[in-house]
């Protein structure tokens, strides 16, 4: 489960600055949702290899008279839903009564809390932060969020208790890598023929061992998400009611989301219901509970996401924010336009026109027009779900991807950089769900965004990938194991192949 980190504290202690630093706001989901306080923000972050959801709760005016009276209801909910609370204080302003009030509340909730003294730049941090130990919440982390100082160390401390051991192992590994890097580079440039199918088959076999875990589970997890009152509950119950094969309701690890196993045409599915606890029979719920946390975690845990939109309300900015999070998470996508029944022909054409205009950047996703209430079109969703999952997990080979790469380069040559043309050598699979294609070459980091989009679209069309995003990664040189834990050389690959042949022969003789 993706951990949740909540930022709490008085106004103007730097919560929003830290939030923007963690989420790199321009690239992350940052949105205000209905029912939340005005300055409450959610985002996805990846710091030091740790994926997590971060919440900015806005300013809390805690007083000695009672913190709960001054806290907004949604801020309380954020603290309850968080795995870790980062309690920000202002190192320059010192300890204030409001800080003490907030600390008292956090101690009562027995939440894992880290006191974070911000704005330590340009001052003697140790002398200014000493008084914050009075809060009784343990060690005080010292950062300067505006400059980014101490932020990475803070996240490692919070999310990786084994950070010291891991860093030690990484340091040893880096030392070893430095010693062998030159030899590996020479071997991959001289000893491996990327146009030889026997050589690339060896490579595929080794790479497949690293990527096989991501597609081992054949159970397709479907998350039904969307804004309040778009019909998520009705759609969930329509799917379950039609099939009548629900085994049991099993609470998932994601807070309050329900993981519901079901089977259809021999395929196992798990429906991730973010609309709250619901038993069969209770189909008509007046209001669907909406939790941003539940929705974001459901997206992370799903294989395929059904983004449900109300045809009568059209596409909102919140829909686009959720869509951005789905794409960032690399999840397969099916667009479901609900409440299609009863609309006039002219209104339907207007809705389709708006979809084409506002969703032109995800032309790879299937769009279904349904009525969850009456059931029309619901059964067809599973064809698109299976198609998207199959595309996201389809296996490809190095020889196939390299052929496609060379075809793309022949049709539209890479640009010149300082008088030299970027050379694209070969491509190999880098992972599944979503499909990852790793392209090796010289000066690939200098390729323009436009050419990268061209390559992505070319691979998508050539591989006929529908319903799933596709990720292209670029790597200098020839070594496909650069940066990986299990590094192999061409000779090691060939030795492994000979060993496997010997083992098979021995078994056959017995």
From Swiss-Prot:
The record's family statement is:
Belongs to the TRAFAC class TrmE-Era-EngA-EngB-Septin-like GTPase superfamily. EngA (Der) GTPase family.
GO MF annotation, one: GTP binding
Protein name per UniProt: GTPase Der
Subunit structure, briefly?
A: Associates with the 50S ribosomal subunit.
* Residue span(s) of domain KH-like: 394-478
Task: Write out the residues that bind GTP 1.
Answer: 9-16, 56-60, 118-121
Pfam families documented for this protein? KH_dom-like, MMR_HSR1
Q: Where on this chain does GTP 2 bind? A: 226-233, 273-277, 338-341
């Amino acid at each position: 489960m993706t951990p949740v980190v909540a930022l709490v504290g008085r106004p103007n202690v730097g919560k929003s600055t830290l939030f923007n630093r963690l989420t790199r706001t321009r690239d992350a989901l940052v949105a205000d949702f209905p029912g939340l306080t005005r300055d409450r923000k959610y985002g996805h972050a990846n710091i030091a290899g740790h994926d997590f959801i971060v919440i900015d709760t806005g300013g809390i005016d805690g007083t000695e008279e009672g913190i709960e009276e001054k806290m907004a209801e949604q801020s309380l909910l954020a603290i309850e839903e968080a795995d870790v609370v980062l309690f920000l204080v202002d190192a320059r302003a010192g300890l204030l009564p409001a800080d003490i009030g907030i600390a008292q509340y956090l101690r009562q909730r027995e939440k894992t809390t880290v006191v974070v003294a911000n704005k330590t730049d340009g001052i003697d941090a140790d002398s200014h932060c000493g008084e914050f130990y009075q809060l009784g919440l343990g060690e005080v982390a010292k950062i300067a969020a505006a400059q980014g100082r101490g932020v990475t160390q803070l996240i490692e401390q919070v999310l990786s208790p084994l950070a010291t051991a891991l860093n030690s192992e990484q340091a040893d590994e880096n030392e070893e890598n430095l010693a062998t890097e030159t030899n590996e580079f020479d071997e991959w440039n001289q000893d491996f023929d990327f146009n030889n199918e026997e050589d690339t088959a060896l490579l595929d076999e080794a790479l497949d061992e690293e990527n096989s875990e991501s597609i081992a589970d054949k159970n397709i997890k479907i998350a039904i998400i969307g804004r309040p009152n778009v019909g998520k509950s009705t759609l969930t119950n329509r799917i379950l009611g039609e099939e009548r094969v629900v085994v049991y309701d099993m609470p998932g690890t994601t807070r309050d989301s329900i993981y519901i196993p079901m089977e259809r045409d021999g395929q196992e599915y798990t429906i991730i219901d973010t609309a709250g606890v619901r038993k069969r029979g209770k189909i008509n719920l007046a209001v669907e509970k909406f939790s941003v946390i539940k929705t974001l975690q459901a997206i992370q845990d799903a294989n395929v996401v059904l983004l449900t939109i109300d045809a009568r309300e059209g596409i909102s900015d919140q829909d686009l924010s959720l869509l951005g999070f789905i794409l960032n998470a690399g999840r397969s996508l099916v667009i479901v336009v609900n409440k299609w029944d009863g609309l006039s022909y002219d209104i339907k054409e207007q809705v389709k026109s708006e979809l084409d205009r506002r969703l032109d950047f995800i032309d790879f996703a299937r769009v279904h027009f349904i009525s969850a209430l009456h059931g029309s079109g619901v059964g067809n969703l599973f064809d698109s779900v299976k198609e998207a999952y199959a595309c996201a997990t389809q296996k490809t080979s190095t020889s196939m991807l390299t052929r496609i790469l060379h075809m793309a380069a022949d049709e539209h040559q890479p640009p010149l950089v300082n008088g030299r043309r970027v050379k694209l050598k070969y491509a190999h699979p880098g992972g599944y769900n979503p499909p990852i294609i790793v392209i090796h070459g010289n000066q690939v980091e200098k390729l323009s965004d436009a050419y990268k989009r061209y390559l992505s679209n070319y691979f998508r069309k050539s591989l006929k990938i529908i319903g799933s995003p596709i990720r292209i990664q670029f790597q200098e040189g020839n070594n496909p194991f650069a940066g990986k834990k299990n590094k192999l050389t061409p000779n090691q690959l060939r030795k492994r192949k000979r060993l496997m042949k010997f083992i098979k022969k021995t078994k056959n003789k017995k």
